[in-house]
Structures are given as C-alpha cells and as structure tokens.
C-alpha cells in the first residue's frame, strides 16, 4: 500500500512555513502545543457562535501563533469581511478577552491581529468548510465537489483534488470518492501545495473531507 505523507510537513522550510513559531525546553514543549490548540479552538468556537456571515460559515483560512517571553501574537487569516474586520475593534477586543480567560496566563499579553486572504476559495480550509455546509444541507456530494472545484478554478488554482470518505448520500457501506482537476504534483517539493483534512458531522455519521490545492511553482 502507498504510504501518504502530509504534503504540508513534507514541504516545511521550502514552500511552507510553520503555523506556530516559538521555542521551548523539551519538558515544556507539550504544554506549549496544548496551549496553541486551546487558542485555536477558542477562536473557532467564538467565531462560530458570534460572527456568522451571510454564506453561513466563518471562513478562517488559518491561525498563526508567534510566542515571546511576554507576548503571544495570534494572526487570524480570514477569507471574508465579517465582524472581525476593520472598523469592528470591539469584536477583536471581545475575542481577545475571551481567549485570555481560557488559558490563565498572567505574565504574557495576548495580541490578536486580522489578515485578509486575497482569494478565499484558493484556501483548502475555506473550500472544505463550504463542502461541509453543502453536505449538511443534504446536497449531493458530487455536486458539492464539482462546485468547490469551480470556485478553486476561479481563484486561479493550477490544480485541485477533493476527496470525501464515509457514508456518502446515506449509503449503508462507507466508501471513498475523489475528483481531480488540473495538476496536483504531490511528489515535487518545490511546488506550493496546500492541504487540509476536515471532518463533518451529518445525519448519516461523520464524513472526512480532504483537499489538495496546487497553488504555484517556486
């Protein structure tokens, strides 16, 4: 059987950079990792509760975390203008307070910044979220996949592969379906490939969505 390496980890240091940037002693490493997960979960939960946009999903592309001794800098990359964007400083302050409460750090300040992603549908997380929303609304999985590919092509992606696994359309037997458009050269390290794995809960059970997008060649 073919062993599939994660395309993001495979390209770290060439076309991909770390989503968390900090240094720690080996004994404190796990604590720092858990803290990062807590921050990301807290932000996603807050956005889901308070800041739904018209299309029905929050549209977070990724969350980068940089840590210093006295400061935690969090950069939220979002695809669509919502309450967190310019002119809504109160929303950011409220989110900052909410996250600060969740991990009780007295010595370090938390600073949250927002960055806008120019082509949202070129981001696999946003595309996966779009497909998840369609599947929850009982749209056919093939239709959802084709629409996601159209959106990625409009965002100038050179290639895209979408895979959905689980009880598709409510079938008794789980299976894996995938569709590819354009080139997705997973073995070439110099090409910039973005990837995400996204679980979605439907009335038939949990489905797994995986997306690979070929963005650019270095």
From Swiss-Prot:
Transmembrane segments: none
Any single Gene Ontology cellular-component annotation: chloroplast
GO biological process: translation
Domain called KH type-2: residue spans: 47-118
GO molecular function: rRNA binding; structural constituent of ribosome
Xref: NCBIfam families: rpsC_bact
Name the UniProt record assigns to this protein: Small ribosomal subunit protein uS3c
Species assigned in the record: Nuphar advena
């Amino acid at each position: 059987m073919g062993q599939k390496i994660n395309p993001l980890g495979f390209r770290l240091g060439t076309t991909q950079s770390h989503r968390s940037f900090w240094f720690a002693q080996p004994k404190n490493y796990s604590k720092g990792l858990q803290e990062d997960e807590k921050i990301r979960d807290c932000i996603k939960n807050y956005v889901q509760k308070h800041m739904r946009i018209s299309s029905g999903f929050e549209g977070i592309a990724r969350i980068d975390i940089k840590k210093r001794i006295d400061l935690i800098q969090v950069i939220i990359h979002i695809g669509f203008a919502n309450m967190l964007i310019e002119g809504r400083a109160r929303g950011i302050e409220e989110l900052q307070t909410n996250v600060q409460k969740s991990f009780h750090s007295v010595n370090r300040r938390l600073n949250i910044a927002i960055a806008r992603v120019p082509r949202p549908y070129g981001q696999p997380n946003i595309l996966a979220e779009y497909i998840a929303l369609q599947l929850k609304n009982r749209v056919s999985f093939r239709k959802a996949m084709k629409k996601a590919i159209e959106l990625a092509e409009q965002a100038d992606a050179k290639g895209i592969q979408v895979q959905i696994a689980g009880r598709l359309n409510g079938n008794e037997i789980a299976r894996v379906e995938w569709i590819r458009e354009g080139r997705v050269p997973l073995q070439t390290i110099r090409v910039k490939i973005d990837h995400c794995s996204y679980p979605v809960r439907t009335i038939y059970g949990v489905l797994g969505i995986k997306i690979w997008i070929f963005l650019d060649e270095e």
